[in-house]
Amino acid sequence: ANPVVTFTMADGKVMKAELYPEVAPNTVNNFISLVKKGFYDGLVFHRVIRGFMIQGGDPQGTGMGGPGYSIKGEFTYNGFSNDLKHTPGVLSMARAMDPNSAGSQFFIMHETSPHLDGQYAAFGKVTDGLDVVNKIAEVPTDYSDRPLEPQMIQNMTVDTFGVEYPEPETV
């Protein structure tokens, strides 16, 4: 069985997402490592764009923060075969212009966005609680796409079903 991550929001709402090690193995290793360390606990979705995606995973909450390292971008444009499409509920890694600049920031798709396919490392999909994604995507935001009321992740856990996932390779 593939690993399953559970997001519990501050309001008690829950999302579950299946991760796909066969699609983006190092990206999944990284996400599992960060979840197990409690890295995402208490962080917010700092960038929310209705009809596009919700983005979180930044310890600074500004869009500039990360875990202090980067991982190689597991997507086609970067020479890595990844055919997972950016459809509603898909998890993918945020990054800067540099294809190998992803760290901890991730986004969850609200609507299908084909222009991201092959350009970002998609690595999982929400299997339960897509209504929670939709609700977050529809909250009022300011001019910089930041929710007026913080959309906080209380905590995240991962069930690896007994499989050991190694620490990520970093760049």
For each predicted feature, which ranges?
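Cyclophilin-like peptidyl-prolyl cis-trans isomerases
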Residues: 1-171
